[in-house]
Amino acid sequence: LQQYPIKGVIWYQGESNAHNMDAHSQLFRLLVDSWRTNWKNPQMPFYFVQLSSLNRPSWTWFRDSQLRLMKSIPNTGMAVSSDYGDSLDVHPTNKQPVGERLGRWALNQTYGHGVTPSGPIYNKVEREGDALVVSFAYGDGLRTSDGQSPRCFEIAGEEGMFYPAQAKIEGDQVRLTSPEVKLPRFVRYGWQPFTRANLVNSDGLPASTFRGDTDSIITIINSCCTMKSDPKKQYSNIKTISGFPAGEAGYDLGVSACYGGFIGDYMVVAGGCNFPEPGKKKYY
């Protein structure tokens, strides 16, 4: 196919990768990079379809992973299709709207037409008192697809227990509260394998499944650890970890050989705790 010039790529993602999103995230990057290399076009547009809705546990995580891929790979776009999913059929039958959504990305990003390319894309979340305020790109005219209150938003505090949130649309933002969560920190939306989430923008295009945090991973780690970092090697020596009683049974002195390496959105930690006899050596 390399002998034929192409303007860009549209990719309909199948379900076979959904069981291993970590492998897929690497393979998908490789796919995009290799095609751009083979066609000698490092900016070649690559637009793809997000997995739809189906009652399989991994699909929620996979959809979120695809959103993160779109944000991290330049000149890509993602067509959300969860609103056309079938809880029992892995192959939704209504493909025309999905094709039209791919076309919006191409018209806007590749051909310069003034059409809205996407539904609301999660941008950031901030805490205001007992509420979380979520901001979106492509969030002009936020509303719901069925005229009901926004649903499928959940928030959690420091402990990570999620509760359904009361959602109020405010311009291009959504304000979230829950009587169960006094100091919210985490948010997620459409976090069901088969979701009936209903947030759309003025063009009627649906928002993607997403999860977010009020703090970056660096802020989170710094809040619970004392670290010494080497930016060249991208590692951190964890000196102490909060929660170990200082001076009691050598807990704080027992943290040894800890390593933290940042790989994209992940932090890999390895090491051990040496506890005095008759304690045991523990790894985490």
Show which residues each predicted segment covers.
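Cell-envelope and extracellular/periplasmic
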Residues: 1-220
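Kelch-like beta-propeller repeat domains
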Residues: 221-284
